[in-house]
């Protein structure tokens, strides 16, 4: 296990470089992301296990998301609390080379397409997912996908805002007024499919998992409640099984879905997950499928642990198929990493080198690099 401390800044997101097995980008925020500045760290893992800072960038607002470019090994995207997405060139100091400023609230995730490598998407608390093309030197979005508006158009029903109790208005941003989203459709995560460049998946605060096809006049083609009405915080496509996705949320569950089994009728009962992983004591903040096989899933949680799960193809190990059991048996996780001493907010797998290497970061101002296969 290797470690690095982001002194004074809490980790929110971390990603391995798609070009190098020893390069990591970490998005951090001061004061736990509630108010204050942010900092982007670009780190290198040395042969002796030390982790050093190649370069860092201070930002005017806290950083919540990070992604590497798929076309340039020196380009890194960040998303921040002021609604801004910034593109940094690590060969240049101090300032981003491009900024994208259409979002009206915090941007919690960014993801670069690994098929159409000219595109990335961003997910925001303003209820939208936006698609961008920085390669054309264009800082306006190509497409905006609106969670609630698309659902109302699809169902023909106008949904009333869910009342949210807010005893105190703590600003998440010091550079832009904290605009309330009374529709409760804050989008936490959005990902491009690994199998189709036109497909995007997103999850939001009203528990919906949504799939979009950017070629369609109404892009929303699948929409269902994934986490029992509680906030859905993270989602990911399986790299080896085109129709299999995973989601995680405040209900403390990571769920595996086969999209071929989801009924298109939004008025039907909630769909049944292919598998459920139970074990975290608090909400799961982030999950990621392994790039080295179709079954391993990594989750990190507010319970300060990181867990590795095995989505076995055996029917007897899948909770979703055990409706006849009075006490369904939860598939045990294969590994538990408990070095973090605060909320674990971000995790990622290394694409290169020996399979099993992952990186995690959290509010304890620590970045840990460790191998899931060597963990006892």
From Swiss-Prot:
Major localization listed first in the record, in broad terms: cytoplasm
Gene Ontology terms: biological process: protein import into peroxisome matrix, docking
Compartments, as annotated in UniProt: Cytoplasm, Cytosol; Peroxisome matrix
InterPro entries according to UniProt: PEX7 (IPR044536), WD40/YVTN_repeat-like_dom_sf (IPR015943), WD40_repeat_CS (IPR019775), WD40_repeat_dom_sf (IPR036322), WD40_rpt (IPR001680)
Disruption phenotype: Specifically disturbs in the peroxisomal import of proteins containing a peroxisomal targeting signal type II (PTS2), and fails to grow on oleate.
The entry's keywords: Cytoplasm, Peroxisome, Protein transport, Receptor, Repeat, Transport, Ubl conjugation, WD repeat
UniProt superkingdom: Eukaryota
Gene3D superfamilies attached to this UniProt entry: YVTN repeat-like/Quinoprotein amine dehydrogenase
Any one GO molecular function term: peroxisome matrix targeting signal-2 binding
Modification comment: Polyubiquitinated, leading to its degradation by the proteasome. Ubiquitination is dependent of PEX5 and PEX20 and takes place following recycling into the cytosol.
GO CC annotation terms, alphabetical: cargo receptor complex; cytosol; peroxisomal matrix; peroxisomal membrane
WD repeat positions: 58-98, 102-142, 182-222, 226-267, 279-319, 339-376
Subunit structure: Interacts with PEX20.
Described function: Receptor required for the peroxisomal import of proteins containing a C-terminal PTS2-type peroxisomal targeting signal, such as 3-oxoacyl-CoA thiolase. Specifically binds to cargo proteins containing a PTS2 peroxisomal targeting signal in the cytosol. Cargo protein-binding triggers interaction with PEX20 and formation of a ternary complex composed of PEX20 and PEX7 along with PTS2-containing cargo proteins, which is tranlocated into peroxisomes by passing through the peroxisomal docking complex. PEX7 receptor is then retrotranslocated into the cytosol, where it is ubiquitinated and degraded.
Family: Belongs to the WD repeat peroxin-7 family.
Protein name: Peroxisomal targeting signal 2 receptor
Protein's organism: Komagataella phaffii (strain GS115 / ATCC 20864) (Yeast)
Gene: PEX7
